[in-house]
């Protein structure tokens, strides 16, 4: 989880919401990582980072981690600094990632993630057989 926070703080240019994800396989071998931000083809220096203008350009950290992973994600574990939204949880299920460890329910106070989307994410995880665990340890960044 500490690596997910490091990735978020180091690479996300979003001034309000910095989310990081790390996917690990057997023996905690890293398979991929990601942060919230625009696709590589969009220069993030040219973006309006205010809400809601930024939303149309954002790729969530979970999707970036999946897209930039190497190796088989089946049975992998995803560590993420905030609860995945329902769309991300569907992608996690599509790649058969079996465990998601998250730190917070909300990314930040202005986040559009709310109780109803949290419940949807939990329902998708349960239906897909994904173990959903709230991280309770210490973070070292």
Where do the language-model regions lie?
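Zinc-dependent deaminase catalytic domain
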Residues: 1-141
């Amino acid at each position: 989880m500490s690596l997910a926070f490091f990735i978020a703080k180091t690479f996300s240019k979003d001034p309000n919401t910095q989310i990081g994800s790390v996917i690990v396989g057997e023996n905690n071998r890293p398979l991929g990582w990601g942060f919230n931000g625009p696709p590589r083809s969009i220069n993030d220096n040219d973006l309006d980072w205010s809400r809601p203008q930024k939303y149309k350009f954002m790729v969530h950290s979970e999707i970036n981690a999946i897209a930039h992973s190497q190796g088989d994600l089946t049975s992998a574990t995803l560590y993420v600094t905030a609860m995945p939204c329902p769309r991300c949880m569907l992608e996690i299920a599509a790649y058969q990632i079996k465990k998601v460890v998250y730190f917070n329910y909300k990314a930040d106070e202005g986040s559009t993630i709310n109780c109803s989307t949290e419940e949807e994410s939990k329902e998708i995880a349960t239906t897909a057989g994904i173990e959903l665990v709230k991280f309770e340890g210490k973070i070292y960044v």
